[in-house]
Amino acid sequence: MKILVVDDSKAMRAIVKRALSTLDRVAGATIIEAVDGKEALGVIEAESPDLVLSDWNMPEMTGIELLQALNEAGSAPTFGFVTSESTPEMHELAKTHGARFLVSKPFTPESLDQALAGAL
């Protein structure tokens, strides 16, 4: 399994990677990174990840813009948000565009694992 973590915060990418490393569900997964949606598009094309975990608000291209671009290209991998943005409207928008989950920051490895259980 290959997982792409997309976040403009290097520290947050490290936190997500650390949480993933504790989960049996994704044991042995290769974890790759991108700093925003624009970079993620290239990484997705080159690496074909099985799962994308994206922040919502990022420079260049937001997480929802990334998901929309993937949908338009017909190549959206399993996609979920790990973000501090968590309004009911954002949950609905994420769901409408095919995101499998939205985990709010701060999160625990257990809450991430529960979200992944419904997506993988």
Residue positions per predicted region:
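C-terminal output helix
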Residues: 107-116
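Helix N-cap/capping motif at the beta->alpha junctions
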Residues: 33-42, 63
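Two-component/phosphorelay signaling modules centered on CheY-like receiver
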Residues: 10-32
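Receiver (REC) domain active-site loop signature in two-component systems and cognate sites
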Residues: 58
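Alpha4 helix (beta4-alpha4-beta5 surface) of REC/receiver domains from two-component response regulators
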Residues: 65, 86-101
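Active-site residues of response regulator receiver
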Residues: 55, 83
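A Lys-centered signature of the CheY-like receiver
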Residues: 8, 105
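Short amphipathic alpha-helix used as the core "switch/output" element in two-component signaling
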Residues: 42, 64-75
